[in-house]
From Swiss-Prot:
Protein family per UniProt: Belongs to the UPF0178 family.
InterPro entries named in the record: UPF0178 (IPR003791)
Protein name: UPF0178 protein YaiI
Annotated gene: yaiI
Natural source organism: Salmonella paratyphi B (strain ATCC BAA-1250 / SPB7)
Amino acid sequence: MTIWVDADACPNVIKEILYRAAERMQLPLILVANQALRVPPSRFIRTLRVAAGFDVADNEIVRQCEAGDLVITADIPLAAEVLEKGAAALNPRGERYSDATIRERLTMRDFMDTLRASGVQTGGPNTLSPRDRQHFAAELDKWWLENQRKK
């Protein structure tokens, strides 16, 4: 089991939760980004720097993740791809994507892209709240416990 992070867009507060979790769970945590990242010294935490470019980090995560891994991303197409490989996907707000919900999320994303392309101002996501952070940490623990039972 490995935790993969789409790190270019992952909020720092979520990365901090992940650093602590990697130590506590003693699981590999790999942050994939197209820029250099500073991470705490740990035998469980490492970075993987990829070339700049559209979806380069996403493609690397899809290539390397395996069934049973967890991918942290707000990128819905990336979440869909890792679900197809048997990995789990969790966004920084603590929403765990599933086969049952990912199609709806992809449809909504495509709809919002169409609105933006036609000039409609759709705005961005709300700021990450303390409740979002708690929900993320709880879902991360839930994933870990589920996978501990499978061993």
